[in-house]
């Protein structure tokens, strides 16, 4: 029978000092021997997805205490990728994922906590906490802050619901007046919560449901809706319940590595492919799998992408649907249910709330014919339509669900947008270890695209060339030296893609990079090219004017230059680490240099390699 980890500091004469300190935090003699549940919060006033989380730790703590545990809250950092976008602040975004993972590990292990509740939400926070949870392998429940509501369109400019990406792309549209742009800016992000499309934050929070580590509705229940409160309370109760099962009954099925098995990772990636999630999820899922010691790699993702169809197109892949519409259509259980009916789901995996995925979907998939009344009511939660930074501030409901499997937000396998899914992996002579593209954001006529290489060596240079209108129809912008090591930090390229879209080149050009893309990216954008240029990857050999071929259907990304010429170029570069040909105006701190010295390319999840 496993002993409470916290017993290390709460039992024995030699721990009198530690107990004295515990007492100073509010614990009493009656608390020693109860499971200590660490609550990893990520409240910050910098990030709309986290601005409402200040009191959420106390809410979870109340449920922990009521269930017989002892709650101890701490905080992690949280970077807003949108605010950090387009300048050197983005160098810190991906590295912050590892800082978050380490900080959770440090706090939990230093204080010998028995279980963990992760209160996450935005882009790097959920992945960082996920990596930590799988590294620690103690009972854990995830609960995120929830998605933002989408914004009202602007008459005469955009008739559809708007979000952050609309504000970015329309900023370079010369037909949009300053007054109209100001109105779009006002409307784009109306409430607290993670940005309203199927961007990275919402994608990752949805994937925690499929992994089995969060509760039904975690990925889609709006931050503003009162229904979200029950998720926080239930997370606290479940954490104590799991802790008691493990420490009192020796039930290892509640541990995160018992839940997030290879089959669970396959489910999560199948969901991601079906819903056309952010390409960043590939990076984070690969990193999480390594922490879980699960053999799951790009080849597995490639195989899944050939089997799993695209069942949903949510912003930025569509102007019709946002996360609130996914919720109305039944949320993640509905997408998983469609995969289940298509024979594309592992039903026997465990979750933190149900014995199996199959049992969970029986109750929560509103399209199954077996769903409970509580589940049906839960998925009627609607936006409030009022600007606010307050959680649980409204209780609006839709009149009915969207269960249109042919033309609604979530389609059936029979009515899929495409036979193959919304994400896929490309290989070729400039991506020997792979590259990732979000096909859900591309018109099928662009699945085969050949163009001229327009080579730049930084995101800043790409933005300058695009806004200077030097990039023309038929060009493929190649941004090298922006990978995990070369950036360092593997910047997101939302501004270049948004500007191409705003200038009317979104369907006439392509962009490829060893960097990555925001979850808000759509269009012919290929990222995560591995190996990266700074690691000697052939993307660093591409020259201006080279012909590049993109063949999505055959999973090919190549430069049409013969092997002998590529070998000559490689020899010319020499054996020293490759760097941009001209200096970049970029201050790289010691912290970033330390990150660059340890980080791997994207095909490995951009994890750090540390010698044992």
Curated annotation (Swiss-Prot):
Pathway: Amino-acid biosynthesis; L-isoleucine biosynthesis; L-isoleucine from 2-oxobutanoate: step 3/4; Amino-acid biosynthesis; L-valine biosynthesis; L-valine from pyruvate: step 3/4. It catalyses: (2R)-2,3-dihydroxy-3-methylbutanoate = 3-methyl-2-oxobutanoate + H2O; (2R,3R)-2,3-dihydroxy-3-methylpentanoate = (S)-3-methyl-2-oxopentanoate + H2O. It comes from the Bacteria. Binds 1 [2Fe-2S] cluster per subunit. This cluster acts as a Lewis acid cofactor. One of its GO terms (cellular component) is cytosol. Keywords: 2Fe-2S, Amino-acid biosynthesis, Branched-chain amino acid biosynthesis, Iron, Iron-sulfur, Lyase, Magnesium, Metal-binding. This is Dihydroxy-acid dehydratase. The lineage of its organism: Bacteria, Bacillati, Actinomycetota, Actinomycetes, Micrococcales.
